[in-house]
Amino acid sequence: MKDFNKVRIAIASPEKIREWSFGEVEKPETINYRTLKPEREGLFDERIFGPIKDYECACGKYKRQRYEGKVCERCGVEVTSSKVRRYRMGHIDLATPAAHIWYVKDSPSKIGTLLDLSAGQLEKVLYFSSFIVTKPFNAQKDGRPLKRGELLSDDEYRELRFGRQETYTIPNSVEDVEIRDGEYVTRGQILGGNVVSKMDGLAQYRFPRRAVIAYSEGVEASLPLPADTLVEQETFRAGEILAELEQDVQITAPVAGTVFMHDLGEDSVMIELREGVEANDSDEEEAADPIRGEVLARVYVPHGMNVQVAEGEVIEAGALLADASEGARLRVSRDSNLSGVTFPKKKGDVTVTAHWTRRVEYPIDPTMHVLVGDGSEVTKGQRVIGAIDKEEEVIAEADGVITLHQPASILVSKAKVYAYDDEPLVVNGDRVEPGDELADDGNLRSEISGRIELDLVRKQVRVIESYDFEAKMGAEAVKELLDELNLDELETELNEQMKDNSRHKRAKARKRLEVTRSFKASGNNPSWMILGTVPVMPPDLRPMVQVDGGRFATSDLNDLYRRLINRNNRLKKLMSQGAPDMIIRNEKRMLQEAVDALIDNGRRGSPVTNPGSDRSLRSLTDLLGGKQGRFRQNLLGKRVDYSGRSVIVVGPQLKLHQCGVPKRMALELFKPFLFKVLEEKGEVTNIKQARKMLERYRDTRDSVWDALEEVIEDKVVLLNRAPTLHRLGIQAFEPVLVEGQSIQLHPLVCEAFNADFDGDQMAIHVPLSAQAQAEARIQMLASHNLLSPANGEPNVKPSRDIILGIFTLTQLRRDNLGAGTEYASEADALAAFDEGKLSLNSPVMVNGVETSPGRLRYTFSNPDEALHAVEQGEIDHQDHVRIRLNGQVYETSAGRVQFRRMVQEALGAQGGLIDTLVDLETTYEKDALKDMVMACFKHLGIEATAGLLDGLKEGGFKLSTTSGITIGIDDIVLPPNKGELLAEADQMLAEIEQNFEFGFMTEEERYKQVVQLWNNTTDAVKDAVFENFSKNYPFNPLWIMSQSGARGNPQQIRQLAGMRGLMARPDGSTIEVPIRASFREGLTVLEYFISTHGARKGGADTALRTADSGYLTRKLVDVAHEVVVRDVDCGSTDSTVMPLGATDERTGEWRSRKGSEIETSIYGRTLTADVEFSDGRVIPEGEMLSMEDVKAIAKDAKHIGEVFVRTPLNCRVKAGVCQKCYGYDLSQAKPVSMGEAVGVVAAESIGEPGTQLTMRTFHTGGIAGGGDITMGLPRVIELFEARKPKTQAVVADRDGVIRIEEEEERYLVRIEADDEQYSSKTATKVPRVLRMTVKDGERVEAGQPITRGAVNPHDLLMYKDTDAAQRYLVEEVQRVYRSQGVKVHDKHIEVIVRQMLRWVEVTDGGDTTLLEGQTVEHWEVDQANEALAEGQTPASWKPVLLGITKSSLTTKSWLSAASFQHTTHVLTEASMRGQVDDLIGLKENVILGKLIPAGTGLLTVREMQVADDRTLEKYGEGSTSSDAVTGGQRYDDTRPGSSINPGYGD
C-alpha cells in the first residue's frame, strides 16, 4: 500500500460505517470478571472483533492455522489471527439520530451555516430546548407565514399547534371582576383586582364562586290610596311619579295574615299577606315558612311611603302597613314598573299589575357546576346548577337571567365562539381551516384555522386558533432539514445574495456559499453529519488489561462507549413502552450528550470525568490532537527499535567521524548482524543457539567480541541529542567499541549538538538497510557536515582548550624593559641586552629598523633547530626569533613554526598547500582558526578539513595541558587608575544633581544623564582594565583566555577586574545607582541586592525563552516544510536589490554596511545584473557569488553601491524553489542540490539560535510616556506572526508633502499629494507620545514611517507593495539576530516570508468560481483566470500577509495542518470538502510512512543507479570525478523531466 500518491478525507455515510463494521455492539458489557472472556454482543465480543488467541475460536473447538477462515458453529467466532482485533470495527445503531459534534461546534458551525442557524439556535434544537419547523404548511405567526427552519420555543410551539390559552387566578378577596364571561379582552386590560390580561382573546370564567339569577316577577296587587291623589294613566314606567299627597295617607291590612315582602328597590315593596301553616311536631321549620302559605292579599307600597311592618309578622285586619305624610311624592321604584292600572268606578282600591326583577344569589362550591352560560335566560323549573348531592342542585324558581360572579380564574384564549341551532358537523378535537363547515347544515363556517371545542350545553362551537404544521426537536429534526436541502437551489439563492450591496450580507453569503459548494463538489451528503450509526473502534486500540490486585485498567473510550450503549438501550426500552414525551425527550438529549462525549469530551458543557476523580475522560478527539495525540506522538514521532541511550563523556582520542559505543550496548544494537556473522563463522547453527550464546558466554568467549568488531567495521550509527533544534542534532559516526557504559563523543562536534559533559545524555540509532547505511555515511557523517546550513561558517571548529593551547603557542612575547630605545648597530643592542638593560623581546630600533635582542641573537637555519633550542631551555615558544624556512628567513617564534608543522602533519598528503593556510605573522585565536578551517575546506575539501580539525584538536589539547594555564584570584588584576575614574564620575554626578536642583533639567533628562554618565564611566574602567592587562600582563591566564576566545568575554573580564556597572530592574529599565565594585573587590550588601534583580530576571527569561523558541521552530517548520528545491530554473526575471550601504542623513556621507551583513545578504546568490568593480573586473549576470566574490564586493562597496540578485521571494516554483533563485547550499558552499529540503533548513536556521535571543522588552527607563520597544525573541515571533506591533508607527498612506498641525495632546497630520484629488481628505490624529520623525513641509513616500515605533507590515503591504513588506520583515528579523551576534543568512528568512505572502484575498470573483473575500494562494487565482474564455471578467485580488500559524493552517495539505494545531477544525473542514492531499510536503509523507519527497526520497534519486568508474567509461559518460559528499554517486539533475514541480489538483 506504499504505492499511492494522494489521500482523500470525507464524511462517512451510514452505509460506509455499516460496511466497516463486523457486527452490532448491543450490550455495554466488556469482559466476564470470572472467566475473563469477552461477553457476547459486548464491547470486546470475539464474534464481532475476532479471536483473542491466534487461530483459536472462543470455545476452543477449532485451533491451529489450518482452520483459518472457518466460523465456529458453536461460538460463532471466526478462526483467524488475533491481529484482526486491531482493525475490525463494530457499530451501534442509535435509537434516534445524533449530531456529530465536530460539525456542530466548529467555528463556523457547518450544520448551522447550511441551515442558516446561529450556533446558539442550533444548540437549542439539538439539545431539546427549542422546536424547529420542518413543514410549515399554511401556519401563521404574528400575522406572517411560518418559515421552514424557524425556531419555536416550547410555549410558542404549543400556542401555534394547540392554540394559545392563558389562565389568570383571581384572588378570593376580589368581590367581582371587571369583565363578563365570553367578553373579548385586549392585552393589558384589567380582568379583576390587580390581574391584567397578557394577551388579546376571548375571556371565559373558570369555577365561579357564586351565581345570581334575576327572576322576572309580575303580580296583580291593590294600591289602597285615594284615587284622586293618583295620576290617572294606565302604565307607569320605572321612576315615574304616582301621586303628590295633599294630606297624610295610611295603608292598612285588608285581611289578617302573615307578612311576606318582595323588595322592589328604593324602599318600594310588595306586601303579601299569607295564610299561616299549622305547625306539627315533625316539621317546625316548615310550619314557620310563610312562603308555603296561601296568598290572601297583595298590597303595592310605592317609593315615598314608610313601611310599618316587618317580614314574618302576623297582623290583624286593619293593621297599619305603611304611611306617608302630606307633601310626600310617591313614585314607582327604578327597578320596577306598573301596568294595567285600574281605577274603581265607585268604591274600592286601585289595582295595578307590578313587574320587577327578583335577584337570588346562589353560592357555588367546588362540588357544583354551572350548567348554563353567563347572561343566559332560564325558565321556571330549569336545572341551572348541578351538584354531586342532588339536594344542592339549583332549579330556577321562575323565568329569569343568570349572571356568574367571582370566578376562581379566567381563561383567556385566542379563539372564536360560534353559537349554533341545529346539530354540529364537527366533534371535539377536530381541526378546521378557514371556510370549513361547523354546524346548521353548513350555514355556520369557521373564519380561522384551529382546533374544535364543543359546548353542547350552551350550544356553542369554540374554534381555538392553531395550525397543523410540523416542528420537531433534536438531531432528528436537523437530519430531516438536511435531507430535504437542495444544494443547487441554495447555491443559486446565495449567488444572488452575493450581489447585495450590504458588505455584511455578502460576507455571510460567501461563508454559506463556500460550505454549499464544498458539499456539492465533495459528493458528501449534508445529512451524513447526523449519525444514525456510531462506529465502534477495534478493541485492541482501546484495550482492557488486568493490573496487580485483580483490578482492570481500561481505556477511557470503553467508559464512553458503555455510557452511550446504556443510554441507547434505555431509550429504546422507554420508546417501546410508550413513555411520556418529556421523559423520552430528556433521554434523547442524554443520548446526544453521550455521543458528544465519545467524539469530543468537554467540547460542550462540562466534560465527563472518571468516577472518583476530576480527570476528564479522553475521547476520540483527544486521541488525535495535542502533543500526546495520534498525529504528533505516533505518526510524526515514532519510537524505533535498534536504539539506545546513555550519558556522554568526552572522547579526545577519537577521530572526527568516530564515536565510542559501550561494548554491551553495541552487542544489543547489532544483535541481528552478530547472529549472522556467528552463524557464518560456524560458532552457532541457528538463531536460538546464538541468542543463548550471547546471554551465557559473552563475557567469557572472545569470539563474540571478535565477531562484533567485524560487524561494526563498515557500519555507522546515528547519534542524537535532544532537543534536536537543527539537522546537525543527528549525525552519523563510525562506532568504536569502548569499555564502560558511556557513549564517547568527539569534542569538536559538541557545538553542533549543543552538548556538554555535565550529565547530558544522547540516543544512538542503527540504520539497518544497506541504503540507509550508505545514506547515513554519505550525507550524515560528522566529518561531512563541517559547515553550518544557517550561515555557511564552520560549525566544527577548534574551541575552548584547543584554542587556548594554540593561542599560547603562537603568541609573541613583548617585553617593556628598554622598549623603543634606538641603537646604532646590532652589536650595541646585544651589548645592552647582555648588560640587562633590555629583555629578550624588548622592541628596539637598530639603524631605523624595528627588531629585538631575540631576533638579533637567535637565527636558526631550520625549524628543528629552533624547536631543539626550546627543548634545551634557551628560548621559549613565544620568543621573537629568526628562523629560515624554505630558503627564506622569517621573523617569527618557535611556537608558530611548531604550529605550522602541526598543521602540516594533520593535512598529511595534502600538506604541500600549508602556506595558503598558515601565516607565520598571525597569532591564532578563535576567528583566525575558524578562517583557517574555512580556507582548508575551500582549497582541500572535506576529508582534508576533517583531518586538519583532528590534528588541531590533538595538538591543542596537548599544548593546553603542557602550558599549565589556569586562573587563580591573583590573576584578576585591578587597574591602578580606577579610583581616579570613579572620583571624576562622582564630581560630574554632583554637577548633574545641582543642575536638576536649580531646575535646569527635567527628571527624565536628569535620569538619562546619570545613566549615560555611569555607562561612560564603566566603559572607561573597562578600557583601563584592558590596557593594564595588554601592557603589563600580556601572558596573564585570564587575559589569554579572553583574548584567544577560549572562554570569557570582555563584559565578564570587566566585572571581575573593573566594575559591575549599572544593573537592570525586572521590567528591563536601568537602576541609576551603579555597582562600583568588581567581583575581585567584593560587593557591598546593597550592591549585591541591586544585582539580584537582573539575575533573577535572567533566570526566568531563559526558562521562558527555551519554550517559546521551541514553539517558534515548530511553527516555522510547519509553514515551510513543503518548500523543496523542485526545479533547476523557474525562469523568473524579477530581481531583488541588495544595497551595500546607505547615505547618512545627518552627515551626508555614504556608509558601507558591515562585511558580515553583506555576507548574509548576497553570499551564494545568483546575479541578475553584472557587478563591475572599480578596477574594471566584472562578475557576469547568472554567476553565483562565492565568499571571495562577496569579500571583494564588500571592499569595493562604495563603487558598486548595490547588487541585483535572485531570491526565493521572487521564485515562481509552486510549493518549492528553484536552484537559481535559492543559490548556494551553505553547508556545502556550492549550488543547492535538487530535492534539498530548504524550507526545513530555513526553519531550523532561524529557530535554533532562538534560545540565544533575549526575552527583553527594552524599556525607556521607567519614564512615563516612553513606549516599550519589543526586542529579542518576542519581536521575532511578532514579525513572523505578522502581529500589530505594541508601539506602532504611523505610516504615510500616499506620496506627497506632509503638513503637521500641533495641538495640546496630539498632532494633526495631512499629506498633500502632487495631484490634488489624491490628497488626504481628513487629518490623521497622532498622539504626542509618538515622536514625529519628519518635519512640516517634508516630502514623504507611501509606506514611510512618520513617527517613532515599529511599522505594521500590513500597512506597508496596503500603502506600498509586497516587496516593501518582504524586505521589511527580513531586515527586522535580521536586526534582532544581528544585535545578539547571531549570523543567519537572509535567504532562510526569505523562504519563511515567501510562505507568509503566498496568499491573496479575492476582491472581485469576476466570472470565475472564486468568491469575494476568499483567501487563496495567488497561483490559484492565476489558474482560474487563465481558464476563462475570451471576454469573460477575470478575478481581481489584493495580497495578504498571514502569520506563520495562520499560513500553516491554511495550507492545501490537510494532513500537515491537522498534525500542526486545531486538529478537529482542520479535519472538520477537510472532510466536509472531501479534500485530497497531494502529499507534496514532508510531514504528510512521514505521517503515511512514505519516503519524503526530498533528498534521496526524490523519485529522480530513487531511480538513479549506482555505477563505478568502469561502467561509466563503458557508457561514455564524461567526467568520473567523485565528490566526497555523494561518495562517487552522481546524477544529472538538469536532464529533461527532472523538474519535480508538483501540479496541485492535477
Swiss-Prot record:
> What are the binding positions for Zn(2+) 2 in this chain?
C1130, C1211, C1218, C1221
Q: Where is this region: Disordered?
A: 1512-1546
**GO CC: one term?**
DNA-directed RNA polymerase complex
Q: Enumerate the CDD domains for this protein.
A: RNAP_beta'_C, RNAP_beta'_N
Give residues annotated as binding Zn(2+) 1: C57, C59, C72, C75
Q: Which GO terms describe its biological process?
A: DNA-templated transcription
Could you tell me which InterPro entries the record lists for this protein?
DNA-dir_RpoC_beta_prime, DNA-dir_RpoC_beta_prime_bact, RNA_pol_asu, RNA_pol_N, RNA_pol_Rpb1_1, RNA_pol_Rpb1_3, RNA_pol_Rpb1_3_sf, RNA_pol_Rpb1_4
Physiological role: DNA-dependent RNA polymerase catalyzes the transcription of DNA into RNA using the four ribonucleoside triphosphates as substrates.
Q: What is this protein called?
A: DNA-directed RNA polymerase subunit beta'
Native species: Deinococcus radiodurans (strain ATCC 13939 / DSM 20539 / JCM 16871 / CCUG 27074 / LMG 4051 / NBRC 15346 / NCIMB 9279 / VKM B-1422 / R1)
What does the record give as the organism's lineage?
Answer: Bacteria, Thermotogati, Deinococcota, Deinococci, Deinococcales
| Gene behind this protein | rpoC
